[in-house]
């Protein structure tokens, strides 16, 4: 497939800048979602070419192609685009995180968990010893073992007492 050099260079530059490229597997799409003026089919074909050379690693999931730039691909694209070695894809750059002090508290510590001071062991034992805990009998006639089990025939079953 003939692809204009300007489109090919634009795809290479975007791939080198980001380090990854995504394209939907849908031929009728006229334009690629990230590269505005380049048809989606041309992006897919250029990336298939780079995959066959071993410059990118291809993955496919849920009707989308994902191409990841390999180390060999970084070197070759750097040479093709005449870029200095200081420029690297954004997937290889390290983000600087600010080491802001965040309050860290476990149970009973400062910050205490979900919404306030944590309960102590005394609070728990007082709750368990509250009214009706040990000495009082809650209703004795409720529960699973109070009634007599009765077998009755249901729909589509023979009665147990049919002979």
Curated annotation (Swiss-Prot):
* GO MF: RNA binding; structural constituent of ribosome
Give UniProt keywords alphabetically: Cytoplasm, Ribonucleoprotein, Ribosomal protein
Start and end residues of each stretch annotated as Disordered: 92-163
Q: Where is the signal peptide?
A: none
* Keyword set includes Lipoprotein: no
User: Where does the protein principally reside?
Assistant: cytoplasm
Source domain of life is Eukaryota
InterPro entries recorded: Plectin_eS10_N, Ribosomal_eS10, WH-like_DNA-bd_sf
**In what ranges is there compositional bias, type Gly residues?**
105-116
Name its GO BP terms in alphabetical order: cytoplasmic translation
The cellular location(s) given in this protein's UniProt record come to: Cytoplasm
Q: GO CC terms for this protein? A: cytosolic ribosome; cytosolic small ribosomal subunit
One Pfam annotation reads S10_plectin
Alphabetized PANTHER family for the sequence: 40S RIBOSOMAL PROTEIN S10 (PTHR12146), RIBOSOMAL PROTEIN S10 (PTHR12146:SF0)
**Its family?**
Belongs to the eukaryotic ribosomal protein eS10 family.
Q: What is this protein called?
A: Small ribosomal subunit protein eS10A
Source organism (scientific name)? Drosophila melanogaster
The organism's lineage is: Eukaryota, Metazoa, Ecdysozoa, Arthropoda, Hexapoda
This protein's encoding gene: RpS10a
């Amino acid at each position: 497939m003939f692809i204009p050099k300007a489109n090919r260079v634009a795809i290479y530059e975007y791939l080198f800048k980001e380090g990854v490229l995504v394209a939907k597997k849908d031929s009728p799409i006229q334009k690629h979602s990230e590269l505005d003026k380049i048809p989606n089919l041309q992006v897919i074909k250029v990336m298939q070419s780079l995959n066959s050379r071993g410059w990118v690693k291809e993955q496919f999931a849920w009707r989308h192609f994902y191409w990841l730039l390999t180390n060999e691909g970084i070197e070759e694209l750097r040479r093709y685009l005449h870029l200095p070695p200081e420029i690297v894809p954004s997937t290889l750059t390290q983000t600087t995180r600010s080491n802001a002090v965040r309050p860290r508290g476990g149970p009973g510590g400062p910050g205490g968990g979900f919404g306030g001071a944590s309960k102590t062991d005394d609070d728990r034992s007082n709750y368990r010893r509250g009214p009706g805990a040990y000495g009082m009998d809650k209703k004795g006639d409720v529960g699973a073992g109070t009634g007599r089990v009765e077998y009755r025939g249901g729909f589509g079953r023979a009665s147990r007492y049919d002979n």
